[in-house]
Amino acid sequence: MSEEDWPSPKFREHVIQRLEPELARNRQNAPNLPVPGDARQVEEYVFAKCMSKDEYMRTIAKVINAINCNSKSAAVPSVLQPSQFHSPPCTTAALLGNTPAGGTPGYRAPVPPDPQPTSAQARNPPVTVATTQASTTPSAPNPPGGLPAPSASATAAVAAAVASFPSPDTSIRPGGQITPGSQAPGGGPTPAPNVPFPNGSSQMNGGPAMGQPPPQMGAPNMGGPPNGYGGYGMMNGPPGSGAPMGGNPYNQQIKKDMDQARPWDPSAHMYQQQPQWGAMPPQQPHGYPGRPMNGQGATPTGPSSVLESLINQPQQYPGHHNQMGPPGDRNVAAQRAAAQQQQQQQQQQQQQRPGMVPNQGMMSSEDQTVYSAKLRNMRGSCDSLRTRARQCRHEGNHEAAHKLEVMLSVLEGKRVVSLEYLNHLEMWIARKQDFLNIAPMSQNQNHMGMNDPMMNGEHAMLGNGQVPNPYGGHPGYGHQQYMGPPPPHMQMHQPPMWHQQQHQQQQRMMPQDHMMMQGGGGPVHGMYRGDMGHDPMTSPVNNHRHAPYPNPAAMRNNMRMPNGPGPIGRDRNSMSGSSMSGPSSGAPSMNPMGTPNQKMGTPGSMGGMSGLDDLNYDDFLPNPTPIDALQPTLHVGQNSMNAGPPVQRSNLNETARKELQILDARFEIDPNHQRHDANHIIVVCKIRNQQFPPLRLVVPTTYPAGNVTVDRAVIDLDAYLYDDLQNSVYERLSRPGLSSITDYLNAWEEQVNQYQNQTSGGLDVAFNVGNDFFYDNLNL
């Protein structure tokens, strides 16, 4: 069927015809799990909810799947437990007395799902409550008065009826009218309009939610007015039998729990105002209205919440574990169910926020433990995901923003997903650590001297959970004012590791970190000195250390002061050897912005050995980390962190400058050239009027003599959405035949134009891998 046929009445009528047999099967096999309304009402609700054909078809499929799950889980063959009771969906013939006592009807005629009158709305309980209680209530109690044990289906119906425990003063007349007694346990009288049903039978006869037999069977408390119990005689028993009277505390506890679990879906209150759903409340299977909870009226939660629950959480209804159990003692069953309900509630409160759908009950206890542990481990990525989602939303990339927000809601516990989805999300976060680390890096730019425009743009977008340095960066704010360990919010936003294996390094360096915080120092022990001189061993600034590595840009200059102007080892790996520099001398100086400037030193108690791990660890990485890639425009202005000489900025020779000036009309050249090593300079180029990541050319100082190459940073923050483009660009630029700056820039622009023609959105393909998996496993 083509796309144009979707909104047509013919297309929708076909869907209604497909839904009708599923709903009829649900009414017969799952009386305790009703779907409100008939097939047309369900289809109209879905049609009003969905905005496209794909969404419409997915939602219809979810409804059918949910109905099938309910029907299969609740259907119990009547031959398993022969009884004088009928199965809950009693037929019209049984209601008229044509079925002999003790027989089981072999034919179930469906009752037309005629809507109830509006006057019966006050008697309807929240259907979600009755639905959920049907799956959590234990086996039914023994029927009083020597009645035989009910069948399996009747037992399930009786268990569900515990949730509707009314006042014993409320009697039910044969004509279907509820007579209000003295007072309902909820505090208000029960409304009692006389509303006959379309099939002519009373409200009580064959009511599946009550689980009683037809009137002709002669049960003492089943048939109507005697003793004032009506269909609830099985629950309360006759007077003098010792059965509990009035409100049921266990039932009240369940109602309280279910009411707390309901507000998770705000659309429930929105859809109940629609005419087809708000004006006529949904009827129970076979036209039996629901009973008020303990005499109370229905809650404002509209019937759409039931269908919304079926659409969103089809596995919300497990296989009714307790419905097949033998009848037990009433008090023991209630106590056991109350303890089980309390335990489940505590687990849900630990694993998710209040108001969430209890999805995780489907997991085993071992899986729940793994699920919670993974959530705790990934909780630190929430701020980064939130920042990136906000940035994508601001840039108009709503698709990427929505995906990031979905991941964020999973990590924050707002969505409970499968363990398989969580594993995939964990792998994705580990693979995208390069751009997820932008959040803490942007936050620390104030006291690390980073003034790059891109970094400032990121910092401007950090709105949640970002706080300034509590130790201050102004004159007079020495560390004598703060003697304790770093505050929790600073521990959450640690300085980034500048490696792709950040989280593994943090875990491996934890013992060393703990030792340094207590008695020693570390490579960064002098990083936040005040305007007074301190002993490196006794300064409380040692407690400020969060991570095993300091800012490499700050250490790159400090390491050169005591050892002369030459670098230690390779210049690109100077961050690794910076912690081996000698002790500093003299009092620290303050720059005009008030930021303490102190040369780095090694504490005497460590004997200069604390930096060995720092020195050698970077050598195990696949590629050495170019320090200039991590040090954007450090010395623009007077906000430097260090008292040493400024970073050496080498200018290009005249030939390279003239060539770049010719290309200035098409390319934007960063004027702040960074030194790559002793003989090469990095030139950062961008294509004008384009949002693609910049290109980093490594130009020799003797240009045009020497070879121009391309540098690809290990942590490429600008290219996190363009993995495919970057791979194709670097593959093209690695081919032979390119020698000059112009050759490289022309080839780069050509490759970008080809990529732009092939893709419309520009979103990274690697970012889109498994998008369907993300959505299919989220139980939307």
Swiss-Prot record:
A Pfam family that the UniProt record links to this protein: Med15_N
Entry's family note: Belongs to the Mediator complex subunit 15 family.
GO BP field: determination of adult lifespan; embryo development ending in birth or egg hatching; locomotion; nematode larval development; positive regulation of DNA-templated transcription; regulation of fatty acid metabolic process; regulation of gene expression; regulation of multicellular organism growth
Keywords: Activator, Nucleus, Transcription, Transcription regulation
Keyword tRNA processing attributed: no
Gene: mdt-15
UniProt subunit comment: Component of the Mediator complex. Interacts with nhr-49, nhr-64 and sbp-1.
Composition-biased stretches (Low complexity): 125-139, 333-353, 574-594
One Gene Ontology cellular component: nucleus
Name listed for the protein in its UniProt record: Mediator of RNA polymerase II transcription subunit 15
Induction: Expression increased by simulated microgravity.
Region spans: Interaction with nhr-49: 1-124
